[in-house]
Design a protein with these regions (language model features):
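Structural marker of alpha-solenoid helical repeat scaffolds
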Residues: 45-47, 76-80, 115-119, 153, ...
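Residue-level recognition of tetratricopeptide repeat
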Residues: 27-28, 55, 94, 132, ...
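N-terminal leader/linker segments that initiate helical-solenoid repeat arrays
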Residues: 2-71, 244
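Helix-start (N-cap) detector for alpha-helical repeat units in TPR-like alpha-solenoids
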Residues: 20, 47, 86, 120-124, ...
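Alpha-helical adaptor scaffolds
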Residues: 97, 113-187
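Canonical tetratricopeptide repeat
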Residues: 52, 91, 125, 129, ...
Length: 244
C-alpha cells in the first residue's frame, strides 16, 4: 500500500516542451507509463531532470536510487528557492521507506515538513510517512503525534486510520484502536490489511467472534497476500472450535 506523492504536471497538448520546467513535466508524464525511457530522457536534462529520474527509478522498483534522485532534486530546488523542494523531500522520504531505510526517510520527511510549504493532503501524507519511519525506529510517542496530524490532513486516506489503529493497539489503547479501525473500515472494508487489523484489535479486546469474522474476511479478500496469509494463520486458533 506504499503511495508516492504525485508530481502534478502535464505537457500542454500538441505543444513540444521548450522550457526546463516543461521538459521536466513532460519527462515526469512519460515516467508514469515508460519509466525506462523516461530515465534516459532525465539524464539528458542534467540536474534539472533529477525529479523525473526519481519517478522513473521508482517505477522500476529501484527505490534507493529514486530516493537519491529526489534528494538531489530537493537540494537543487532549495538552492533555486523553488516551492517544489518540500514535495521532493517528501518523495525522497517515501522512497527511502520503500527501500527499507527508516532513518533516512525520517531525515527527508523532517526536511519536507520543516519547509512549511506542504498543505492539506500532501502535508497529511508526509506526516503519515514520517510516522511510519518513527515506528520503524522505535519512537512510538512521536509517531502517535504525527498520526494524529495525519488523520486530520489526510482524513480520507484509509492507511492513516489503519496505522493509527495499529499503533493504538500496540500501545494498549484499545478504545482508540477501535475508533480508528472503524474509520478505516468505513473507507476501505475491502482491504485485507484493514480486516486483518480489525481482527487483531477484536482479539486483543477479547471479542473472539468479531476477530474470527474479520480474519475470515481478510483471508477471503486476499488469500495469497501477506495480510490474507496472516489472517489464515490467526484462524488456526479456532480449528477446534465447533462454532467455526
Amino acid at each position: 500500500m506504499i503511495q508516492f506523492l504525485a508530481l502534478l504536471a502535464a505537457q500542454a497538448a500538441g505543444t513540444p516542451p521548450t522550457s526546463p520546467t516543461q521538459k521536466l513535466d513532460a519527462c515526469v508524464t512519460q515516467a508514469r507509463t515508460d519509466p525506462a525511457g523516461a530515465e534516459q530522457v532525465a539524464r539528458t536534462l542534467g540536474r534539472a531532470g533529477e525529479a523525473c529520474r526519481g519517478v522513473a527509478l521508482a517505477g522500476q522498483d529501484d527505490f534507493a536510487g529514486a530516493a537519491t534522485a529526489f534528494t538531489a532534486a530537493a537540494r537543487n530546488a532549495e538552492l533555486a528557492k523553488e516551492a517544489r523542494a518540500a514535495d521532493y523531500w517528501a518523495q525522497a522520504g517515501n522512497a527511502w521507506l520503500a527501500a527499507g531505510d527508516a532513518a533516512k526517510a525520517r531525515a527527508a520527511l523532517d526536511a519536507a515538513l520543516a519547509a512549511g510549504t506542504l498543505t492539506d493532503l500532501n502535508r497529511g501524507e508526509a506526516y503519515l510517512d514520517r510516522a511510519r519511519a518513527l515506528v520503524a525506529t522505535g519512537d512510538m510517542k512521536a509517531a502517535r503525534v504525527d498520526l494524529d496530524l495525519a488523520t486530520k490532513d489526510a482524513a480520507d486516506d484509509p492507511l492513516a486510520w489503519l496505522l493509527s489503529a495499529t499503533l493504538a493497539r500496540r500501545m494498549g489503547d484499545l478504545p482508540r484502536a477501535k475508533l480508528d479501525i472503524a474509520q478505516a473500515l468505513r473507507r476501505s472494508a475491502d482491504d485485507a490489511s484493514v480486516q486483518l487489523e480489525a481482527g487483531n484489535i477484536a482479539a486483543a479486546a477479547g471479542e473472539a467472534d468479531r476477530a474470527q469474522a474479520a480474519w475470515k474476511e481478510a483471508a477471503r479478500l486476499a488469500p495469497d497476500a501477506p495480510a490474507g496469509r496472516s489472517a489464515t494463520n490467526a484462524l488456526t486458533q479456532f480449528a477446534g472450535d465447533p462454532k467455526k
